[in-house]
C-alpha cells in the first residue's frame, strides 16, 4: 500500500506567494542513502539571503514554482520536494556559498541521464534571483546507478580484448583534422599504427563532410588497421567517429563499423546528446565494440568557476550513460586542468569507491558498486617531454594521445609514433625499477634518446614547447 499522506485538499488552500525557504530550506533533514545529493555554488543577487537562494535552487529544480498552486494539494510535497539541507560559505568569496540539496529518488526516470539533468540543471540556471549558479558535484546512490548499464565494456575487458597490460595505451589524433581525402587519411592512420601506437583517432569534428564521406573513411581506416596488425602482430584500432545529425544515422555508422570488424567507435557525447550516447553504448556492449568518448563543448559548460557545471559532474554522467574512454585533460598540455582537480574526477571515472575529498573537489563519497570504469584520455598539446609527467600523473589505466606530438615529427608519422612508444616504454620501465619520474623524468628520456634516433629527433624539435598559463578553474 502507498503511504498515507496529508494533502492540502484536506486542510484548505491559501493562494499567494511565500518565501521558498519556508518550504524548501530544511537544515534538520537527515539525508537518505537513496537520495541524489547535489552541491551547488550559489551567487545570489544583492539582498537575497543565502537560505532563500539555496531553497529557491531546491524548489525550482524539483517540485516548486513561483507561487502556491492549488494542485499542490493533490500530492505530498514532503515526499517529492528537493530540500536544501546545508549551506556553507565559500572561503575568500564575499557573497557566494555552497548549497547542498537532496532529491528523492522518485523524481527521476530510471536509466536516464537526460531526465536527471533536465531536472537538476534545467530552468533553475536562468533564475533571476541568482547572479550565478554552478553544479559542483553530484552523489549518485547505488539505488539509481544500478538502473544504468554504464560503460559498454570497461577497463579490464578492454585490456583483455587488446591483450595489452602494464602500461598506458598510446593514441594519436589524425591531423589536419579537416581537409584530407579518405585515402590520405587512411595512409596517416596506417603509418601511425605501424610505428607503434595502439590507436589513432578521428578528431571530434570529423563526421561526413564533402572532402571525406564517412563510409570512405571507415573503409580506408579498416584497411590501415588490418595492414598494421599484420605487420606488427599487435591489435590496433582507430576511433571511427559515428556522431551524426540523427540517431538513426549514428547507429547506421556504428553498424557499418562492426561489419568491417574494427574494435572501436567514437561519439561526441555532449554535442550528440545523452540519449544518443546511451543508445550507442547499449549497441556497443551488445556487439563487442569499444566506445571512445570525446567531450567537445565541455568548456562552454564547465570552464567558468561561478556558473555552469563542473566536469566531474559530466564525468559521472558519462560513466552512467556509457563510454569506455573519455577525454579528461592533460594537466601539462595546452588544455585547462589543475592537477588535484583532474585527479579527483579521474578517480571518479576509474574507481569503484571514491571517498569525499574536498582538496580534490570531491564533495561526496561515491560508490559505483560494480559499474565498469572508464579510461581517462590525456590529449591536447602533449609531446615526448611530457611522457614522464603523464605516466606519473595518470598511471597505467589511461590513454595518452599525441596528435601534433606524433604527426609533427620531422621524419614523418611512423617515426613520430616510434618516438612516443619508446618514450613510454622507457618511462614505464624506469617507474617499475623504482625511479622517481617526477624528479628524474627528463633524464630517463635523455637516456632513451641514445638508442632511439626517432626519440632524439622528437626531443630536439619540441624541447622549447610549453603551455604555461594560469588555470581559470581552481578550487
UniProtKB/Swiss-Prot annotation:
GO terms for cellular component: chloroplast. The modification N6,N6,N6-trimethyllysine is found at residue 14. GO terms for biological process: photorespiration; reductive pentose-phosphate cycle. Residues 1-2 form a propeptide. One of its GO terms (molecular function) is magnesium ion binding. InterPro entries: RuBisCO, RuBisCo_large_chain_AS, RuBisCO_lsu_C, RuBisCO_lsu_C_sf, RuBisCO_lsu_fd_N, RuBisCO_lsu_N_sf, RuBisCO_lsuI. The disulfide bond which can form in the large chain dimeric partners within the hexadecamer appears to be associated with oxidative stress and protein turnover. Its EC number is 4.1.1.39. The active site is at 175 (proton acceptor), 294 (proton acceptor). Mg(2+) binds at residues 201, 203-204. The modification N6-carboxylysine is found at residue 201. SUPFAM superfamilies: RuBisCo, C-terminal domain (SSF51649), RuBisCO, large subunit, small (N-terminal) domain (SSF54966). Substrate binds at residues 123, 173, 177, 295, 327, 379. The record marks 334 as: Transition state stabilizer. The basic functional RuBisCO is composed of a large chain homodimer in a 'head-to-tail' conformation. In form I RuBisCO this homodimer is arranged in a barrel-like tetramer with the small subunits forming a tetrameric 'cap' on each end of the 'barrel'. Heterohexadecamer of 8 large chains and 8 small chains; disulfide-linked. The disulfide link is formed within the large subunit homodimers. This is Ribulose bisphosphate carboxylase large chain. It comes from Pinus wallichiana. The gene is rbcL.
